[in-house]
Curated annotation (Swiss-Prot):
The active site is at D47 (proton acceptor), E203 (proton donor). GO terms for biological process: carbohydrate metabolic process. Its EC number is 3.2.1.37. Pfam families: GH43_C2, Glyco_hydro_43. This is Putative beta-xylosidase. The lineage of its organism: Bacteria, Pseudomonadati, Bacteroidota, Bacteroidia, Bacteroidales.
Length: 518
């Protein structure tokens, strides 16, 4: 069994500077993240979709093999908090055996219609799914399978003024864009769909209508190298006019595309998109937008070629509403904090929060490698520099501790023979001894791509566990950290105490536009 308590993040420390450069700009340290002095953006996500209902904005994003699509809420469109989870397990073959890395939810869409919030997503192998809720904080209805089909992706629903429902989507292999009619409740497709556009790696469909124009807001050109395209037509089936509205240009933001065009309460417009990075994964950015001749203009056209480029910093959409700290699960004995995610489906018979009040219990199960360990509990890395620690004690032949995952799965932990490290499926004892308890730590420097495990016998003096190593994102996700326990033969007992995911102090001179993602 694995006991954990006091799961928490530390606050990011922020200091302000004068906004005296230009009316719309502030000078910032671009290594910082999130809000400027009066709010912090935490734990964002890839392939974002955002809507605004009233004075609040809501975000969903791809979660792939992690359970199970978090919903985030914001008062100012910059600082976000988790408020719910759409599903907690995926009841399809292979999801109880860690067989669907890079599968699961791809590029969801969230919409609000007639008093209900709707979320749609496709999976590579299983089909098109949707769920609804009257309150975005949940509960969300059980997943409804709209169509059993493979290789669809990136769906987005749309309800026209006459009540007719549609859904746009793309196909694996990046296109074409196809539009279907749906039943009014959004649960049934009414036709086989009509192709309305073909383009270079056209995907990520987002529908909207404004001033009588139907818009398809789509990325093209590929994840790491693409651009943002907008299509418009007077008829939902076209013909569509095309315009490129955002590109990398002279900036360092590669592939600035795929996201959501959203208006703020004051009527200003904004565009969320992601940027693929090699270690952190897909990093969310927010661009200013406006309309000219019924075309969206996004970012700033620095080279005057008619196409916007990402800005480094910009005035916030909504004035500050106060700083929000990192979310933890310390304030509840009834549920894990929403920032925690299981890798694939959890085995509910092998974890609980009831064996000891305020503690998490994980029961060890056999696995051939770290990648295949069941009940692997993970969370996103926060920012470029972070630190995570846990305290572990064991009985029997269990292996347990702290791990990092991406393309590589590696970890440090405790077994009956002492402290071990594991890389590439090879487990090595680095400190022999019969320890009752050991503290473990990992530091993640995603800017230098330098990561290092540590261990401590007293919780104060740490020494390296092996050498520094490089990491890269994998299976469409950035690197993650978490805790696990496993055994090779018979069931054993693990006790891990004072588990806490502790973000290191990050001094932010001011708020950049980059919104961190893993």
């Amino acid at each position: 069994m694995h006991h954990a308590r006091n799961v928490q993040f530390s606050n990011i420390h922020v200091s302000t500077v004068d906004e005296d450069v230009r009316p719309d700009f502030v000078e910032v340290d671009t290594k910082g993240w999130g809000d400027q002095g009066d709010g912090t953006y935490r734990n964002p996500x890839s392939d974002p979709d955002v809507i605004r209902v009233g004075n609040k904005x809501y975000m969903v994003a791809s979660d792939f093999h992690x359970m199970g699509m978090q919903v985030l809420e914001s008062d100012d469109m910059v600082x976000w908090r988790y408020i719910s989870q759409i599903y907690r397990r995926f009841n399809e073959p292979g999801w109880d055996a860690n067989l669907h890395y890079a599968g699961g939810s791809w590029a969801p869409s969230i919409r609000y219609h007639s008093g209900l919030f709707y979320v749609y997503f496709c999976t590579p192998d299983e089909g098109l799914y949707m769920s609804t809720a009257s309150n975005p904080a949940g509960p969300w209805a059980p997943l409804h399978l709209v169509k059993r089909v493979a290789k669809w992706e990136d769906p987005c629903p749309f309800w026209d003024e006459d009540g007719q429902a549609y859904i746009g989507r793309s196909q694996h292999g990046a296109g074409p864009i196809i539009v279907h009619r749906m039943s009014a409740d959004g649960k049934t497709l009414l036709d086989e769909g009509k192709t309305v556009y073909e383009g270079p790696i056209a995907e990520g469909t987002k529908f909207m209508k404004r001033n009588g124009w139907y818009y398809l807001i789509i990325p093209e050109g590929g994840v790491g190298t693409g651009w943002q395209t907008v299509l418009r037509a007077r008829n939902i089936y076209g013909p569509y006019e095309r315009r490129i509205v955002l590109e990398q240009g002279s900036t360092g933001v590669n592939g600035p595309h795929q996201g959501a065009l959203v208006d703020a309460p004051d009527g200003s417009w904004w565009f969320y998109h992601f940027q693929e990075t090699p270690v952190l994964g897909r990093v969310v950015h927010l661009q200013p937008a406006r309309w000219e001749a019924d075309w969206p203009v996004i970012g700033v056209d620095y080279d005057k070629n008619g196409i916007g480029e990402p800005v480094a910093t910009w005035k916030k959409p909504v004035s500050s509403v106060g700083t929000a700290g990192f979310q933890t699960c310390d304030d509840s004995n009834d549920a894990l904090g929403l920032h925690w995610q299981w890798n694939h489906n959890p085995v509910d018979t092998h974890w609980n929060l009831t064996d000891r009040k305020g503690w998490l219990t994980l029961k060890a199960m056999p696995a051939d490698s770290l990648k295949m360990v069941r009940n692997m509990l993970t969370q996103k890395v926060v920012g470029y520099q972070s630190e995570s620690t846990t305290k572990v004690s064991i009985k029997g032949d269990s292996y347990a501790g702290l791990f990092c995952s991406g393309k590589l799965f590696c970890g440090v932990g405790l077994c009956k023979d002492g402290v071990f490290i594991e890389f590439g499926g090879q487990r090595k004892i680095i400190d022999k001894g019969s320890y009752q308890e050991v503290w473990f730590k990992v530091t993640n420097d995603c800017e230098q791509n330098r990561h290092l495990f540590y261990y401590s016998i007293d919780g104060e003096h740490y020494q390296p566990a092996g050498s520094a190593f490089a990491m890269s994102g994998g299976y469409w996700k950035g690197i993650r950290v978490g805790c696990l326990t496993t055994f090779l033969q018979a069931k054993r007992l693990l006790r891990a105490r004072h588990l806490r995911m502790l973000n290191s102090t990050i001094s932010i001179k001011n708020s950049p536009n980059s919104l961190a993602d893993c």
